């Protein structure tokens, strides 16, 4: 069965500009401004983006930001820690929602 995700499709990202150039341009300007150096340096922002990409399980962003981090000099150890933080937060959310099971058990008793 073919995968929904095909890394070569990432190159088609800009095609959205053909259907709504104004909105695409606004998004790209906002994105560029968000990712440039500010209170956080660009390397840190790429690391955050990588962690978020893993947390939301978005394969195109995982692919893109894995490469961007490597090109920015992010070490494998830094990437591993960032992804581990994302996993901990995601896992913590699952555990936090366990309270719903507790509430259901309380209602049943």
What are these language model-derived features?
Residues 48, 52-64:
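Short, thiol/selenol-centered motifs that function as redox-active sites or metal-ligating centers
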Residues 1-44, 97-109:
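Acidic, glycine/proline-rich low-complexity segments that act as flexible tails and inter-domain linkers
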Residues 42, 60, 77-80:
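Short, solvent-exposed positions on alpha-helices
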Residues 64-78, 102:
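Iron-sulfur (Fe-S) cluster-binding segments and ferredoxin-like electron-carrier domains
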Residues 84-100:
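Short Fe-S-cluster ligation motifs
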């Amino acid at each position: 069965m073919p995968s929904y995700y095909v890394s070569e499709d990432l190159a088609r990202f800009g095609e959205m500009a053909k259907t709504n150039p104004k909105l695409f341009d606004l998004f790209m300007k906002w994105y560029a401004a968000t990712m440039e150096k500010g209170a956080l340096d660009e390397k840190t922002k790429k690391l955050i983006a990588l962690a978020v990409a893993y947390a939301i399980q978005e394969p195109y962003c995982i692919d893109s930001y894995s490469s961007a981090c490597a090109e920015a000099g992010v070490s494998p150890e830094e990437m591993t820690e960032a992804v581990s933080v994302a996993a901990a937060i995601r896992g913590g959310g699952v555990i936090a929602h366990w309270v719903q099971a507790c509430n259901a058990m309380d209602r049943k008793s």
